C-alpha cells in the first residue's frame, strides 16, 4: 500500500505523463514533509522554466508563492489583491487581511525596522535577508 506522499508523487507523475501545456496544482504539497515539498516545488519550477508550462498553484503555504510571477490573494472567495510576489508578500497588513502571515524573512525585516535597524529592501528569502544584513553593517 502506498503512503500519502507516494500517492501524491504517483498522481503528479501521471499528470506529467500527459504533457499538458497548463498545469493547475491545488495544494500540491499539502500532505508532504518538508523534503517532499521542496522536491515537488523544484519539479514545478523546472516545468515552468525549462519546459515552458503555464503553472497555476493554489496554496496556503505563503513561502510557496515567493517564486511566482504573479500572486493573487484571495480571502472568503474574493480576490483582494494581485501583483508580483514581492509586491504582495512584503505587505504584512495585506497578508493579514487575507488571513495569512508574512514569510519569516519579511517578518524579520519589520521586526528589525521596529527595533531601529533599517535594511535597504524587504527580503523574501533567507538568502536575501542575509545579503541585506551584511550590506547594512
Please give the residue ranges for each predicted region.
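Catalytic Walker B motif of ABC-type/P-loop ATPase nucleotide-binding domains
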Residues: 23-26
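Conserved catalytic motifs of ABC-family nucleotide-binding domains
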Residues: 19
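Helix N-cap at the start of a conserved alpha-helix in ABC-type nucleotide-binding domains
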Residues: 34-36
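ABC ATPase "signature
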Residues: 82-83
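ABC ATPase nucleotide-binding domains
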Residues: 95-137
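Hydrophobic anchor residue at the start of the ABC signature
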Residues: 12
Amino acid at each position: 500500500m502506498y503512503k500519502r506522499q507516494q500517492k501524491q508523487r504517483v498522481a503528479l507523475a501521471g499528470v506529467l505523463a500527459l504533457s499538458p501545456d497548463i498545469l493547475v496544482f491545488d495544494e500540491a504539497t499539502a500532505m508532504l514533509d518538508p523534503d517532499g515539498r521542496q522536491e515537488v516545488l523544484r519539479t514545478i519550477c523546472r516545468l515552468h522554466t525549462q519546459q515552458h508550462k503555464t503553472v497555476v498553484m493554489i496554496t496556503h503555504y505563503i513561502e510557496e508563492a515567493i517564486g511566482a510571477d504573479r500572486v493573487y490573494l484571495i480571502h472568503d472567495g474574493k480576490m483582494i489583491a494581485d501583483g508580483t510576489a514581492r509586491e504582495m508578500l512584503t505587505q504584512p497588513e495585506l497578508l493579514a487581511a487575507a488571513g495569512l502571515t508574512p514569510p519569516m524573512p519579511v517578518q524579520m525585516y519589520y521586526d528589525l525596522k521596529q527595533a531601529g535597524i533599517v535594511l535597504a529592501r524587504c527580503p523574501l528569502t533567507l538568502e536575501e535577508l542575509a545579503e541585506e544584513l551584511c550590506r547594512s553593517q
